[in-house]
Amino acid sequence: MATGKIVQIIGAVIDVEFPQDAVPKVYDALKVESGLTLEVQQQLGGGLVRCIALGTSDGLKRGLKVENTGNPIQVPVGTKTLGRIMNVLGEPIDEKGPIGEEARWDIHRAAPSYEEQSNSTELLETGIKVIDLICPFAKGGKVGLFGGAGVGKTVNMMELIRNIAIEHSGYSVFAGVGERTREGNDFYHEMTDSNVLDKVSLVYGQMNEPPGNRLRVALTGLTMAEKFRDEGRDVLFFVDNIYRYTLAGTEVSALLGRMPSAVGYQPTLAEEMGVLQERITSTKTGSITSVQAVYVPADDLTDPSPATTFAHLDSTVVLSRNIASLGIYPAVDPLDSTSRQLDPLVVGEEHYNVARGVQGTLQRYKELKDIIAILGMDELSEDDKLVVARARKIERFLSQPFFVAEVFTGSPGKYVSLKDTIRGFKGILEGEFDHIPEQAFYMAGSIDEVVERASKM
């Protein structure tokens, strides 16, 4: 293939000059003689191309030779990637030797056509009460975990991977986009301890890496997930964190000379998000169910980045700092979280009525809190006292010990089936457990455990 040379280096953006009759295409991967990979972003005319470095540009100098590979970045796909940790280029970073893949796919691929897509209303049971009841996941759907810093997005995601791998024995792909290296390390050890590592492919582009790596690592993970889907499997695709994907795009956009738009984001924000999200879909062969953690800057859900993500999701799980401050984990806000699946035609009348009953009771309690704060509980009517008592039990019963958090909580994790979840909340709403003290409901699994606990109090 054609050879060019570096003519300008501005941080992560590199300009390379090629002969005019052999200019690389946009998204072609170029190899610098030092071993660094570049990706073409713009053709500037006169044989010049502007590229993003997928690695540090330290030590580069003008005049270095650059070779065009003639293809976009290609990464290993298939079952050989399971249990391995790779970087954005699909190179192993776990010191376990080469991957030995059977095939390599381009990371830039077209989304499935309209005819190939399928829609399913089958529910995916997660074993987490609040999610299964209030914002159920669809098999092949897209889920967003929204939350500010430190409210438990990563822990929730780890629990979902563990539950689904063990209870549904499915394959998962985890893309760590611009998150802390420590979290990636914890995640790896957690998967090893839960014996599910052989069912997960891990792709990391961490916080300390150049923007090119963080921008493309989500596509690397998605390509691996697409291969499993096209083999007829139901695969889970986890992204932590989709906000960092946007942020990497913002960093690169300014260096490429584009005008910034609202709040300094790149003008192509909606398009970049769409290109990624449209590929995460289910076809007639298999399904990709995706769970995406979305960092919410300054807890502001109207920020352009989380707001753009909302449009693509089927379920939104909103993690609330107020609930976390009460010590209730998972800190999912049952009044803010939504799901397209929460429809009597999909989940059935009983599930729908119980979920709405739970939300109604909690909403009423929220309204009464001001009165309680000023006048105290004694001023409430008997009916309202009952609502408050039940709401407090529901709040506590929405908490649950996680398997992946056993180290912190000291209590064994619980997986609660959807049937048991509905039975428990239905009982609370109907007053079946009015005689049980509210502390018995805190950090419990099924309702049977609550009853057993209460008998010992």
Curated annotation (Swiss-Prot):
It comes from the Bacteria. Produces ATP from ADP in the presence of a proton gradient across the membrane. The catalytic sites are hosted primarily by the beta subunits. Its EC number is 7.1.2.2. It is a peripheral membrane protein. One of its GO terms (cellular component) is plasma membrane. Its main location: membrane. The keyword Membrane applies. It is an enzyme of class 7 (translocase). One of its GO terms (molecular function) is ATP binding. Keywords: ATP synthesis, ATP-binding, Cell inner membrane, Cell membrane, CF(1), Hydrogen ion transport, Ion transport, Membrane, Nucleotide-binding, Translocase, Transport. Pfam families: ATP-synt_ab, ATP-synt_ab_N, ATP-synt_VA_C. This is ATP synthase subunit beta. It is found in: Cell inner membrane. ATP binds at residues 147-154. F-type ATPases have 2 components, CF(1) - the catalytic core - and CF(0) - the membrane proton channel. CF(1) has five subunits: alpha(3), beta(3), gamma(1), delta(1), epsilon(1). CF(0) has three main subunits: a(1), b(2) and c(9-12). The alpha and beta chains form an alternating ring which encloses part of the gamma chain. CF(1) is attached to CF(0) by a central stalk formed by the gamma and epsilon chains, while a peripheral stalk is formed by the delta and b chains. Belongs to the ATPase alpha/beta chains family.
